[in-house]
Amino acid sequence: MKNQTTKRSSFSGKIGFVLSAAGASVGLGNIWRFPYLAAKYGGGIFLLIYIILALTFGYTMIMAETSLGRMTKKSPVGAFASFGNSRWSSLGGWINAIIPVLIVPYDSVIGGWVLKYLVEYVRGHAQPVAEDGYFSAFISDGFSTEICFVIFSVITLAIIYAGVRNGIERVSKFMMPILVVLSVIIAIYSVTRPGALAGVKYFLVPNISNFSWMTVVAAMGQMFYSLSIAMGILITFGSYMKKETSIEESTKNVEIFDTAIAIMAGLMIIPAVFAFSGGDPDTLQAGPALMFITIPKVFASMGFGTFAGVMFFLLVLFAALTSSIALTESAVSTFEDELGWSRKKSTVLCGVIMIALGSLSSLGYGPLANVKIIGMQFLDFFDFLTNSVMMPIAAIATCLFVSRVVGVKRIEEEVTYGGGTFKRRKVFLFMIQYLCPIFAGIILLSSVANAFGWISM
């Protein structure tokens, strides 16, 4: 392995890493994506499969990526290249580096939508945003969506510009505790609504009759998105981790944080939907629109829906920011390492890419609505490309790279450095060498085949 001598930024300690990594995980993936997938794909059975995958596949990938980052002190491309040139190092390094560059633009578009809704609730417009057609009218208005998207992007870039400790870590330490408190308050409020207990049961109690292969595919895709694996973030954050920080303990804390917020998000939204609609199947199948169409209707039916709306969308805004910050940092770190640029110059370049690609997604439901890629709007296509295609490929490349090039013994040495624990060592070894690459390959083929209509799931 090539030596790394360049002075590199770092987190102040375990708390800084955990909150920043958790912030990457606890983003729109948990608050926006997880509840609508759980509602759509069987509730409790989806949750059970997700937890099993997170504790096995997710654990393995977090450990591998964080270890790679810490032992090399480099972003994805450099981390993979540190062990020589091979097809796995080239593929693994660059695909991990490119994924965040493609995700953060459309992630920021959704962040802009959240910002718009928060402003409307602060202005006391709980009833107008709940009206039929409001959301579709908003996203089809290219000017409004573009302005909201740009404002959200500028906030993200300003935090990245400030650096690791002054920007990312400081913001994560501020926002994550508030996010947890807001989650608990809203979840308690939601589950105490009349008729909500049926939603709690649907979400928490597995029903095998709701199981399908698509439930597994959806849970797997959500795990990639939610835990921020196979997208270079954990390699980048691992490169900022101090040697004395326990990788396994940090991984466990991220798992707990992520799963707890995912469950809390489900309890915020699904019981409220049941209380409002009685568990209407069409409402549960609403998909991505669940948060922007159904939830405002739920709030409008409440006595103090404006307050609930402000609290909820403030929470979602914080979650959106933490994930966009992590994604942007991964991209900026790659520019710094591979191009030798300063953080300021790298942030500006990343900003240009964000605005250019994000504008396609932002305008994709308005002026560019007739422009589609394989039948998908720009935002849907970028989500499919990254989540269903590139992330499984990145996971396969990372697994093969770790097991065949780096060697699992090196990972074990990095994890146990300074007396660090490796309690799930056997799980890690079996998953990284066998199950993870095979399972990721099956998910990749299933997702592509389903998208092109070759199979129906």
Task: Specify the residue positions occupied by each region the protein language model found.
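Extracellular loop-to-transmembrane helix junctions
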Residues: 38-64, 144, 390-394
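Transmembrane helix-boundary motif of multi-pass solute transporters/channels
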Residues: 13-53, 238, 249-252, 256-259, ...
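Inter-helical loop and helix-membrane interface segments of multi-pass membrane transporters/permeases
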Residues: 5-8, 36-41, 74-95, 108-165, ...
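Helix-loop-helix connectors at the membrane interface of multi-pass transporters/channels
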Residues: 2-4, 111-140, 241-244, 249, ...
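Membrane-embedded translocation segments of transport machinery
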Residues: 2-7, 11, 169, 173-321, ...
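Membrane-interface "cap" regions at the ends of multi-pass membrane proteins
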Residues: 1-32, 61-66, 70-83, 87-91, ...
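A generic transmembrane alpha-helix motif of multi-pass inner-membrane proteins
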Residues: 379-400, 424-457
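Select transmembrane alpha-helical segments in multipass membrane proteins
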Residues: 10-21, 45-49, 87-101, 147-152, ...
